[in-house]
Amino acid sequence: MSVTPEVKSRGMKFAEEQLLKHGWTQGKGLGRRENGITQALKVTLKQDNHGVGHDPAKEFTDHWWSDLFNKTAASLVVDSGKDGVQIRRLSKETTQRSHPKPSLLYQKFVKTATLTSGEEKPDRDLGNCSDVDNHEPTPPKILTDEMLLKACEGRTAHKAARIGITMKAKLARLEAQEQAFLAQLKGSKALGTSQPLTDSEPSQKKKKKRKQKEGEEAATTEKSLGDELLGHTDRSFRDSRKKKKRQKAERQGTAIGSEEEEAAGESGPRELSTEQSDQPSRKKKKRRKQRHEEDGEMGVCDEGGRDVTSRPKAVNSGGDKDPRRSSKKRGTCGEDLDTQEEEGKDDLTKGERKVRRKDKRKRQQCCEEDLDVSSKDDGGTWVAEDAGERSRQYPKERAKKKKRKRDRGSEVDLS
């Protein structure tokens, strides 16, 4: 018959490996004398509701009927006499075990002697003892520290003291603290009545001083907070003003740059026909005015208030208006602007002066445009001269414009 090998679990294999490391071999028992178990304990799962020690096969192995028959047969006694055979049944009392009463001698054990090396040594004289002494419990004997130290031969629970490390300094310090505390308690009891009367006045003074200090601290903190808030608001106001000035200067600078570019682009030769009527010229003026208002594109003016953009020489076909009159008006407009600027120069900063200059240029340009529109609306039309003269003047005017631009840039940098 082939024996199937026992399949070992993972835990069993691990346990065998650990035992083999320590010199155990298969078949040996556990323990120093190797008389322990040789088979490992196997864990079984309990899947029933029976108690511990219950044998589920007892109903098959327990022959209760044979035991009962044997008991009844043992209780029957067969007597053979003159009268014949008689069967007598034993009483139940004979089957029970008898429990005799214990003797009074051993009910209460009294120690009378101690055995010492085979000899008896009586503890006390039995003749002098009485029943009262025997029944009274003796009080336990309380040993003092010295007696305990002597009985333990100098050994204590403090193991470090055996090698000379004691706590004498600490114990002395604790004792001194206790004595100081006791002395303080005695002094406080002696001065118990007089102390409250004397301490009441200093305590009130201390309270007043404490309140004054708290009030002063609160005042100083409020003052410091107010100063900080004022400084912060002043700083924020200054920063906002500077920011606004910077933004305004940037906007005006971009507007002037766009105006100069537009003026340079529009400075080309313009030919005006003499055959145009008054109505189309007015329409063109209106369109130009609308374009200037929408785009913010204005012509660049010089210091005297004159237009820098290249304009062809023209003659007035209608003799009602004189071109000199318009130039005079431009001059007066520029002078008014100069006087306004000089009046406000004293109380202005550098940034505000720049802004004023740019505003002045814009006002000059607006004045010139209004004058041009009014002179043309009265019936006079500008007629261009021959193309050759215009072409000769164009490069010169262009060079003048560039020069003026450079001069303005240098003025702005210096200011």
From Swiss-Prot:
Q: Which residues carry this modification: Phosphoserine?
A: S130, S258
Q: Where is this region: Disordered?
A: 116-141, 191-415
Q: Which InterPro entries match?
A: G_patch_dom, PINX1
List-wise, which residues carry N-acetylmethionine?
Answer: M1
Keywords of this protein's UniProt record, alphabetized? Acetylation, Isopeptide bond, Phosphoprotein, Ubl conjugation
Outline the extent of the G-patch domain: 11-57
User: Does the keyword Iron-sulfur feature in the UniProt annotation?
Assistant: no
**Composition bias, Basic and acidic residues:** 118-141, 224-239, 387-397
Query: A GO term (biological process) for this protein?
Result: hematopoietic progenitor cell differentiation
Q: Which GO terms describe its molecular function?
A: nucleic acid binding
Among SMART domains, the record links this protein to: G_patch
List residues, modification Phosphothreonine: T4, T116
Q: Where is the composition biased (Basic residues)?
A: 353-364, 398-407
- Covalent link (Glycyl lysine isopeptide (Lys-Gly) (interchain with G-Cter in SUMO2)) residue numbers: K46
One GO cellular component this record assigns the protein to is:
nucleolus
Keyword rRNA processing belongs to the record: no
Residue ranges annotated as compositionally biased, kind Acidic residues, are: 335-345
Ranges of compositional bias, category Polar residues? 191-201
What this protein is called in its record is G patch domain-containing protein 4
